[in-house]
């Protein structure tokens, strides 16, 4: 990420999303920003022209790949301008043609589309509007999936503000749009995914044997704990850990066994903190009525983790000590990070079978249609 990227706090009435929006350190006016968006996108969104295409084998499936419909981009610019929050250029300059060109240049066969942005689909304008924005984003991504056969899959974003409306969103995503899975945030305001209010939604997703991709946002509680850094550097991976622990301690993992969970950025800090969490809770967790019947580490080993911005040798060493490579998928966090992170994995000297499993095999096992 560009070293000039910064973050600005903004006052919000909405209790269901983070207090922070991230952007470049220099705040541009709406007119200046829109005038320069296309030029910015050409340099920031697309990869270096000197980058070489990746080899065809192994096939690459990017499981952590973001999209932003034009209507969403415009709404976010308005929302940020109202709060004097700087714009995040690569997000607002994203477009489908540039996305596909970048995939081609970097050997990405298929990308799983998901939404990742503060404030999600709720722009402080009511649950109904959030529901409508979720529908708009799902429709846009589903059209990309249809128009570019085989190049995209869809993790459908949900609003999560009203249980009945969210259940209808799930029905529409799976039954009408044929989504491949669901895209959730780690937190919605001051509630993480293990909160009891989300149990009816998760029970329905369990009934459908859904794949859930979970993307972190900086939580309300912790936006001011960044010790002078861009908040995403520290707080984003920690919020993945918070929501994983909330799902663990609430018994959600133990009770809803038919959900396949995919967590971002190598699981945040879970690989490093697994032993500490186990030391505090493992004895009370075990047993047929416990929240981790076979032990906490066994619960963590059932989850899936992507490699987005987590391909450093130390990070991968921790992750592969905790889980087998069968639980790891390739991800990039594009357009915020480059698409060529497979090179870092190649340098680790993984056995070819393990590299192929991460690159595509594990994801095609989760979503068989991607093997076509």
Regions found by a protein language model. Give the residues of each.
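Mid-to-C-terminal alpha-helical segments outside catalytic/metal-binding sites
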Residues: 2-48, 56-59, 63, 69-110, ...
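Histidine-centered divalent metal-coordination motifs
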Residues: 64-66, 215, 265
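Active-site environment of divalent metal-dependent phosphoester hydrolases
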Residues: 68-70, 119-121, 161-162, 190, ...
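Active-site gating loops and adjacent loop-to-helix segments of metal-dependent hydrolytic enzymes
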Residues: 69-94, 123-131, 219-240, 277-302
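Active-site gating/metal-coordination segments in enzymes
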Residues: 109, 114-250
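Generic enzyme active-site microenvironment
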Residues: 213, 263, 331
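Active-site-adjacent C-terminal substructures of enzyme catalytic domains
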Residues: 237-241, 254-258, 282-283, 288-339
């Amino acid at each position: 990420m560009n070293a000039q990227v910064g973050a600005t706090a903004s006052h919000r009435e909405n209790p269901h999303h983070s207090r922070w929006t991230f952007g470049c350190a220099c705040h541009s006016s709406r007119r200046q920003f829109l005038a320069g968006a296309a030029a910015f996108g050409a340099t920031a969104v697309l990869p270096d022209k000197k980058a070489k295409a990746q080899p065809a084998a192994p096939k690459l499936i990017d499981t952590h790949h973001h999209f932003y419909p034009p209507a969403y981009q415009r709404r976010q610019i308005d929302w940020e301008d109202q709060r004097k929050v700087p714009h995040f250029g690569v997000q607002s300059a994203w477009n489908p043609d540039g996305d596909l060109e970048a995939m081609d240049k970097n050997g990405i066969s298929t990308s799983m589309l998901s939404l990742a942005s503060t404030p999600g689909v709720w722009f402080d304008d009511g649950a109904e509007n959030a529901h409508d924005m979720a529908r708009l984003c799902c429709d846009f991504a589903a059209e990309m999936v249809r128009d570019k056969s085989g190049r995209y899959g869809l993790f459908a974003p949900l609003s999560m503000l009203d249980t009945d409306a969210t259940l209808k969103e799930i029905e529409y995503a799976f039954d009408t749009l044929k989504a491949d899975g669901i895209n959730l945030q780690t937190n919605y305001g001051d509630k993480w995914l293990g909160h009891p209010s989300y149990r009816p939604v998760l029970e329905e997703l369990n009934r459908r044997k859904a794949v859930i991709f979970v993307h972190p946002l900086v939580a309300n509680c912790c936006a001011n704990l960044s010790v002078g850094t861009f908040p995403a550097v520290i707080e984003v991976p920690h919020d993945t850990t918070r929501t994983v622990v909330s799902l663990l301690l609430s018994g959600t993992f133990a009770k809803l066994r038919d959900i396949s969970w995919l967590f971002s950025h190598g699981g945040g800090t879970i690989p490093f903190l697994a032993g500490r969490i186990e030391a505090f809770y493992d004895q009370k967790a075990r047993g047929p009525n416990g929240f981790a019947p076979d032990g906490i580490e066994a619960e963590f080993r059932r989850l899936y983790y992507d490699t987005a911005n987590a391909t450093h040798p130390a990070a991968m060493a921790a992750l592969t000590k905790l889980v087998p490579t069968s639980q790891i998928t390739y991800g990039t966090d594009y357009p915020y990070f480059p698409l060529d992170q497979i090179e870092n994995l190649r340098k680790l000297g993984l056995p070819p079978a393990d590299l192929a499993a991460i690159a595509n095999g594990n994801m095609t096992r989760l979503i068989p249609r991607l093997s076509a």
